[in-house]
């Protein structure tokens, strides 16, 4: 009997030890979260800094270890990963907020927040052809780009807002300067065309490779201009500054960075072959949302709360990107975010 009692005690001790060990494993597992973030390439630098700070904040204040699985792409592609490919994500951050109501609402999300701005510039290095002339006579930018020995680039308008915004900038230049700049730079070197103030970007774009280079997202062009493979790129001002590129600013009437010029910008629109959607030119505003079926929705909303706070603003402004004050939200805004935003109907 004594031996049987000892065996029972040992068995009970093993069961208790296993239960404690299992509970400990489950407990630590439940506190580790990976947020999946699909975002615009131009958000890469500030998002990485926000994510690093948020991870430290979450572990210290929420008791959660948060890691991030980031995928940078053109914003159109970021959205299509969800709508066309059925990919799961927690957070979507885009360089053109209108992609969210146009393509994600109501099936994939029910709210979005406008939070940051930007403008289009023309960036280059000391290796670029006619660089001194570009610096001293920036108003001649379209003449310099048109020269036979100059190559320039922009991102794919079917995948990336920076691409279709670059085309909008060039078409707006027609109106501002009273010259056929779009025809000379774009129509004579690609199958992209315009009819009046309407631009059409075919699903499959072809280019004269000796003149124009197109890449999926604007950050894919950085290495090409830095190496001297191409001379000039249309890119966001924040990205040019983050990567220490030289650049010229464009008139506010065409750079898509001035809210007071919204009516002038709105004369131009583009139809994308990739989505069939028509997008009207407007000031550049970034948008962010958490998807309805986000694998870690509660933590994703906490991340947005951190992003939209003074912490996110500080990081974005450090990285040369202006923050909306306050951010503007639409739709069924989560309660946690309401104190940080202005809610519009």
UniProtKB/Swiss-Prot annotation:
Keyword set, alphabetical order: Cell membrane, Membrane, Metal-binding, Molybdenum, Signal, Transport, Tungsten
GO molecular function: metal ion binding; molybdate ion binding; tungstate binding
Topology in membrane: Peripheral membrane protein
Main location per the UniProt record: membrane
Residues at which tungstate binds: 41-42, 75, 160-162, 218, 236
Protein name: Molybdate/tungstate-binding protein WtpA
Source organism: Pyrococcus furiosus (strain ATCC 43587 / DSM 3638 / JCM 8422 / Vc1)
Originating gene: wtpA
Locations listed in the record: Cell membrane
Binding site for molybdate: 41-42, 75, 160-162, 218, 236
UniProt cross-references to NCBIfam families, sorted A to Z: PRK04168.1, tungstate_WtpA
Family membership noted in the UniProt record: Belongs to the bacterial solute-binding protein 1 family. WtpA subfamily.
Record text on subunit structure and interactions: Monomer. The complex is composed of two ATP-binding proteins (WtpC), two transmembrane proteins (WtpB) and a solute-binding protein (WtpA).
UniProt lineage: Archaea, Methanobacteriati, Methanobacteriota, Thermococci, Thermococcales
CDD domains for the chain: PBP2_ModA_WtpA
